[in-house]
From Swiss-Prot:
Annotated gene: ndk
Residues annotated as signal peptide: none
Residues holding ATP: 11, 59, 87, 93, 104, 114
The organism of origin for this protein: Psychromonas ingrahamii (strain DSM 17664 / CCUG 51855 / 37)
Protein name: Nucleoside diphosphate kinase
Cofactor: Mg(2+)
SMART domains: NDK (SM00562)
Subunit structure: Homotetramer.
Lineage: Bacteria, Pseudomonadati, Pseudomonadota, Gammaproteobacteria, Alteromonadales
């Protein structure tokens, strides 16, 4: 199976609770290798552009407010079947419905403050990765 990339965001709630290292370690233990990583704080304009597909929905403005409330860690993770592996690890959006042992079950507070974001398809991964990273910011994976 070919290598695949996904975008991972450790959201402001998890960064603010000093969970970044614990979450990153889980990804690495699962074989999701970081090939790009940085800490950012989105402006309202950036958050609106990233979440443009949700504009007009009732949760849109609270989502923008939350995603601009503090720093977050964005990264590109690479592995075979990276998107599905990542999504299995993070669990359902609603932490009360997330399986035990998933990141959201362990660290999330609510559907909005749910610790992490992950791409849901190869098309969204490509779009989301390009939003945060230029091609020259993405490194080849480290040798095993």
């Amino acid at each position: 199976m070919p290598l695949e990339r996904t975008l991972s965001i450790i959201k402001p709630d998890a960064v603010g609770k000093h969970l970044t290292g614990r979450i990153l370690a889980r990804f690495e233990r699962a074989g999701l290798q970081p090939v790009a990583i940085k800490m950012v704080r989105l402006t309202s304009e950036q958050a609106e552009a990233f979440y443009a597909e949700h504009k007009g929905r009732e949760f849109y403005q609270p989502l923008i407010d939350f995603m601009t409330s503090g720093p977050m860690v964005v990264q590109v993770l690479q592995a075979e079947n990276a998107i599905n592996l990542y999504r299995e690890m993070i669990g359902k959006t609603d932490p009360t419905q997330a399986a035990a042992g998933t990141i959201r079950a362990d660290f999330a507070e609510s559907t909005r403050c749910n610790a992490v974001h992950g791409s849901d398809s190869p098309a969204s991964a490509a779009k989301e990765i390009a939003f945060f990273f230029s091609d020259d910011e993405i490194c080849p994976p480290a040798a095993d």
